Structures are given as C-alpha cells and as structure tokens.
UniProtKB/Swiss-Prot annotation:
Signal peptide extent: none
Gene3D superfamilies: Nucleic acid-binding proteins
CDD domains: Ribosomal_S12
Gene that produces this protein: rpsL
MF (Gene Ontology): rRNA binding; structural constituent of ribosome; tRNA binding
Protein name: Small ribosomal subunit protein uS12
Family that this chain belongs to: Belongs to the universal ribosomal protein uS12 family.
C-alpha cells in the first residue's frame, strides 16, 4: 500500500483497455479467405468436435474462426465474412463466421433463431 506522498509523486495509472477482437481493426465485420478448415476439441469438462476455420483477412491477419450451426459447405479458398465473439471452450477462437453471407450457406431446416444462421423463412 503506497503512502500519500508516494501517490502525489507518482499517481495511479489506469489499466490499459485491451482489444478483444484485434483482427477486425475496429470494424463490425471483415472479409477473408479460408486457408484451412478443420475440427478441434474443446476444453476440459466438454467433449465434441468443433468446426473451425483459419481465415486470412483483408487486413492481412490470420484468425481462427468458429463455424456455427449444424453442417457447413466451407473449404479452402472459400470467401467468408467474420464477426467478433469468442467461443468459451475453444482457446484462441475469438471470431465467428457469419452464415448465409458470401460463400457460406445458411443452416438447412433451421426453424428458430434463423437470422443468426442465415436460414430463409420456411414456407
């Protein structure tokens, strides 16, 4: 605990604000090209094969992005749009791929929360 004199000499420094999505460079979304599409396993209490893609963005940065929803059509050289938003049980995955935009198809037969998965309204 500093003394009053020490605080007068050198005041407290505010904590620097850390950017949670540096690859987006302040933009809401960014376009990129898939360089690798693969599956990975989550952290300890959970168990699954999560679908992720390594994406080279227009900013030149490579980011690991999660592919939400059941089934996808992504492969190498697919052009995708990414947004911020981490996946809690996948370390290093800080971005989501937007479904139903550019080369990514929407989730088939999706009835609820369709806008998040790029699914059209069922007839």
């Amino acid at each position: 605990m500093p003394t009053v004199n020490q605080l007068i000499r050198k005041p407290r420094q505010p904590k620097p604000v850390r950017n949670k999505v540096p690859a987006l460079k302040g933009c809401p979304q960014r376009r990129g090209v898939c360089t690798r599409v693969y599956t990975t396993t989550p952290k300890k209490p959970n168990s699954a094969l999560r679908k992720v893609a390594k994406v080279r963005l227009t900013t030149g940065i490579e980011a690991v992005c999660y592919i939400p929803g059941e089934g996808h059509n992504l492969q190498e050289h697919s052009v995708v749009l990414i947004r911020g938003g981490r996946v809690k049980d996948l370390p290093g995955v800080r971005y989501h791929i937007l479904r139903g935009v550019l080369d990514t198809q929407g989730v088939k037969d999706r009835k609820q929360r369709r806008s998040l998965y790029g699914a059209k309204r069922p007839k």
